[in-house]
């Protein structure tokens, strides 16, 4: 089902420093910000390391902004960046990065496993500390207005920022991708929220919005058949009668001769990582297929990992208060 494609996922990624690799005093210093917002922009470039470096550069060494992670995937030809900061500083860095991507990426020459409609495909803002979902919505709308006027880019507001119910789901907006958007954008129900009702000739369109944190989680299967991965994905996602807060699709990893069930867990407190893992394993059995590994793309809330560890270790009455790093950060 097309409306269940995840926002982002990846494999064979070049993963760059994770937060636990930063000195603890650096993290504590950034946590002194009174308001912290997260942004996870997805760019349609996963192969050209020079372009990737240029796109990421606005997030480096900026006051009020911390680059936590970025991973590029060659199969999917996609870059996922995780950055946090004070809302105003974050906003400026994101707008600058979008401008660089619009300049560098030409989707007429882009091919990859991941669905995409724009050079900058999706830009979600997530409230983390001292700010509300309403604050994140306001930031997303301001960024949308500014990139539309500065870069002549059509902008769709999605998720919590959506201007209409049919625009909440990213995959519904993205259906038809860059190629199909040339005609789709002229339909009255698909006029952009900001910017011209004309697809940008090289950069396409962008979805910008506010949402809660999600976990991008992929499970690799020893199945060369993409059909098997598709079938498993259909069964575990919510629309197919599966897990309530799971979006999933099957992906082929040609260079490794395997397939993958790629998921977004949109509320990890209600659809746990371990539950997704076990359900994929359960469904894979009927095909005589087994799990050969899994991965988390980008960053993951500590709570989500603690929950999974507690399940597999059978921990009784375990809480976040028993996690050393969590206590240090208090």
Regions from the PLM with identified roles:
Residues 4, 20, 26-29:
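Charged/polar low-complexity intrinsically disordered segments
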Residues 9-12, 26:
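Composition-driven detection of intrinsically disordered, low-complexity segments
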Residues 2-9:
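Extreme N-terminal basic, low-complexity initiation segments
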Residues 32-330:
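Long, contiguous binding/interaction regions
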Residues 9-10, 17-19:
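Short hydrophobic alpha-helical segments enriched in small aliphatic residues
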């Amino acid at each position: 089902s097309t409306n269940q494609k995840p926002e982002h996922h990846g494999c064979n990624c070049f993963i760059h420093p994770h937060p636990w690799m930063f000195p603890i005093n650096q993290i504590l210093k950034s946590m002194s910000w009174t308001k912290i917002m997260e942004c996870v922009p997805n760019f349609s470039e996963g192969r050209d390391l020079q372009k990737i470096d240029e796109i990421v550069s606005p997030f480096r060494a900026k006051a009020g902004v911390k680059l936590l992670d970025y991973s590029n995937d060659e199969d999917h030809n996609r870059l996922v960046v995780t950055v946090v900061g004070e809302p105003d500083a974050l906003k400026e860095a994101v707008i600058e990065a979008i401008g660089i991507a619009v300049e560098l990426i030409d989707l007429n020459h882009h091919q990859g496993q991941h669905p995409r409609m724009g050079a900058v495909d999706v830009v979600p803002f997530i409230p983390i500390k001292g700010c509300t979902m309403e604050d994140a919505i306001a930031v997303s709308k301001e960024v949308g207005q500014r990139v539309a006027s500065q870069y002549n880019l059509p902008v769709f507001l999605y998720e919590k920022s959506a201007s209409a119910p049919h625009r909440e789901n990213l995959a519904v907006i993205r259906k038809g991708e860059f190629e199909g958007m040339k005609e789709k954008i002229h339909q009255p129900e698909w006029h952009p929220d900001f910017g011209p009702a004309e697809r940008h000739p090289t950069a396409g369109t962008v979805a910008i919005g506010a949402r809660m944190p999600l976990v991008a989680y992929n499970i690799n299967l020893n199945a060369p058949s993409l059909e098997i991965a598709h079938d498993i994905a259909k069964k575990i996602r919510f629309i197919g009668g599966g897990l309530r807060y799971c979006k999933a699709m099957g992906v082929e990893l040609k260079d490794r001769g395997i397939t993958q069930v790629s998921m977004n867990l949109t509320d990890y407190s209600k659809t746990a990582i371990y539950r997704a893992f076990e359900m994929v394993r359960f469904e894979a059995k009927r095909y005589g297929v087994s799990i050969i590994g899994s991965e988390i793309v980008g960053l993951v809330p500590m709570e989500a990992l603690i929950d999974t560890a507690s399940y597999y270790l059978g921990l009784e009455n375990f809480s976040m208060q028993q996690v050393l790093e969590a206590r240090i950060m208090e």
